[in-house]
Every structure is written in structure tokens, then in C-alpha cells.
């Protein structure tokens, strides 16, 4: 029986193979279509009981396309290549984070 390599899983989408830029853009566009405000966070060790994620810049209040968010993800990835990076969606009516998914893992492999 063939099994997947052992690696930490953090969120629902982390059970899928790593997302391509096009797949990330589609997820971000869906999030924006729902009215959520995108933000980018990063963390070296994303274990929930140990750390909080650090917000990359401010949430992208004026983002009008998924490409703008992807550009920020790339910029964050180039500066913090040793960190996990995720995209989050904030609901300004409920005033909470409603969506999040990891878009980059350090030493990421495709299987």
C-alpha cells in the first residue's frame, strides 16, 4: 500500500497537493467575491498552541483582484522563505477571520 509522506497538516486544504498560483488565485477570488478582506500572515512554527501568526503588512482593504494578493504573497515568500505563509479572509461585518489556507510551506515538495 502506498501512503503519503509524513508531514504536518494544518488546515483542510493542506491535505491536497500544494496549490498552484492559478489555484490560489481562484480561492482568493472566491473569497473576495464573498466580500471578505484578504490578508497575508506568516509564521516559522505554526503550531497553534505555541504561536500566533504575524500579519504581513495590513489587510488588503483596497485589493480589486486576486493578482494583487498573489503579488503580496510572492513578496512575503521572498522575504520570509523559511516561514509558512497563509492567506486569510476577514469579514468586516462579523469582525472576525472567516477563511484561511496555507499557500506556502518551507521546503515544500510536490508529491
Swiss-Prot record:
SMART domains: RuBisCO_small (SM00961). GO terms for molecular function: ribulose-bisphosphate carboxylase activity. It is found in: Carboxysome. It comes from the Bacteria. GO terms for biological process: photorespiration; reductive pentose-phosphate cycle. Its main location: other. One of its GO terms (cellular component) is carboxysome. Keywords: Bacterial microcompartment, Calvin cycle, Carbon dioxide fixation, Carboxysome, Photorespiration, Photosynthesis. PANTHER family: RIBULOSE BISPHOSPHATE CARBOXYLASE SMALL CHAIN 1, CHLOROPLASTIC. Heterohexadecamer of 8 large and 8 small subunits. Belongs to the RuBisCO small chain family. RuBisCO folding and assembly commences when the nascent large subunit folds with the help of the chaperonin GroEL-GroES. Requires homodimeric RuBisCO chaperone RbcX2 to assemble into RbcL8 octamers, making RbcL8-(RbcX2)8. The exposed C-terminus of RbcL binds in a cleft in RbcX2. RbcX2 is displaced by RbcS; as RbcX2 is removed RbcS mediates the ordering of an internal RbcL loop (Thr-63-Leu-69) in a catalytically active conformation. Interacts with accumulation factor Raf1; dimeric Raf1 acts after chaperonin GroEL-GroES, binding to RbcL(2) leading to an RbcL8-Raf1(8) complex. RuBisCO catalyzes two reactions: the carboxylation of D-ribulose 1,5-bisphosphate, the primary event in carbon dioxide fixation, as well as the oxidative fragmentation of the pentose substrate in the photorespiration process. Both reactions occur simultaneously and in competition at the same active site. Although the small subunit is not catalytic it is essential for maximal activity. HAMAP family: RuBisCO_S_bact. This is Ribulose bisphosphate carboxylase small subunit. It comes from Picosynechococcus sp. (strain ATCC 27264 / PCC 7002 / PR-6) (Agmenellum quadruplicatum).
Amino acid at each position: 500500500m502506498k501512503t503519503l509522506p509524513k508531514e504536518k497538516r494544518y488546515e483542510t486544504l493542506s491535505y491536497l497537493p500544494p496549490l498552484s498560483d492559478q489555484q490560489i488565485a481562484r480561492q482568493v477570488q472566491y473569497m473576495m467575491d464573498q466580500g471578505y478582506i484578504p490578508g497575508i500572515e506568516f509564521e516559522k512554527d505554526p503550531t497553534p498552541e505555541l504561536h500566533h501568526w504575524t500579519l504581513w503588512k495590513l489587510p488588503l482593504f483596497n485589493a480589486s483582484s486576486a493578482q494583487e494578493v498573489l503579488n503580496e504573497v510572492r513578496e512575503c515568500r521572498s522575504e520570509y522563505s523559511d516561514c509558512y505563509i497563509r492567506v486569510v479572509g476577514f469579514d468586516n461585518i462579523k469582525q472576525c477571520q472567516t477563511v484561511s489556507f496555507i499557500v506556502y510551506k518551507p521546503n515544500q515538495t510536490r508529491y
